[in-house]
């Protein structure tokens, strides 16, 4: 497999996605990640600019997400070197099924699984974003005007490894879901 990108529906990859794919192929041939990278591929990639800093979002197929997460720390480090310091995040390529209404209920014989609901997908995106850190708590603050602010508590042990990326995580999550989120590293309760 010379290319590392398989898009849904067999559509062609654009130039940016091809460059990401090429970087993964180079990593596979040159580094000690060869064995782990051989079976892996991505479904799409996006580049977004936030506060004059660019970030790269790489979508991976759900069955391969666990395998990507095993090597994610090293893979992110290598890709960030290659793409001159742009922050790289890996996210599982999930599908959201629409909420069944009275009209559509007849057409769908199957019940919508919990993993395909909007809430579940958005929570999972948040977990993928902050990997390798773990979410230890979450507070949702609803303001008087109805807007929500999500406070996510991350594991204090991982503060040194991901603290510099917190702004990227906030802006990527806002771009993908439209939800405001802040990250904190609270002291563990005893």
Curated annotation (Swiss-Prot):
Q: Name one GO molecular function term.
A: structural constituent of ribosome
Source domain of life is Eukaryota
PANTHER family in the cross-refs? 40S RIBOSOMAL PROTEIN S7, SMALL RIBOSOMAL SUBUNIT PROTEIN ES7
Family that this chain belongs to? Belongs to the eukaryotic ribosomal protein eS7 family.
Taken from the UniProt entry, a GO cellular component term is: 90S preribosome
The answer, when asked if Transmembrane helix is one of the entry's keywords, is no
Keyword annotations for this protein, in alphabetical order, are: Ribonucleoprotein, Ribosomal protein
The protein here is known as: Small ribosomal subunit protein eS7
Any one Gene Ontology biological process term? rRNA processing
């Amino acid at each position: 497999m010379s290319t590392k990108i398989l898009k849904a529906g067999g559509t062609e990859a654009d130039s940016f996605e091809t460059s990401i794919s090429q970087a993964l192929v180079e990593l596979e041939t040159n580094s000690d990640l060869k064995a782990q990278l051989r079976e892996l591929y991505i479904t799409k990639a996006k580049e977004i600019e936030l506060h004059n800093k660019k970030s790269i979002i790489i979508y991976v197929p759900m069955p391969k997400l666990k395998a990507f997460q095993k090597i994610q720390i090293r893979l992110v480090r290598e890709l960030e070197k290659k793409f001159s310091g742009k922050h790289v995040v890996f996210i599982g390529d999930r599908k959201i099924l629409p909420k069944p209404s009275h009209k559509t209920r007849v057409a769908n014989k199957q019940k919508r699984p919990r993993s395909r609901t909007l809430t579940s997908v958005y929570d999972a995106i948040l977990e993928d974003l902050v990997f390798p850190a773990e979410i230890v708590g979450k507070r949702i603050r609803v303001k008087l005007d109805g807007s929500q602010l999500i406070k996510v508590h991350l594991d204090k042990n991982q503060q040194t490894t991901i603290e510099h990326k917190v702004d990227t995580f906030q802006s990527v999550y806002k771009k993908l879901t439209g939800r405001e989120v802040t990250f904190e590293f609270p002291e563990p309760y005893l």
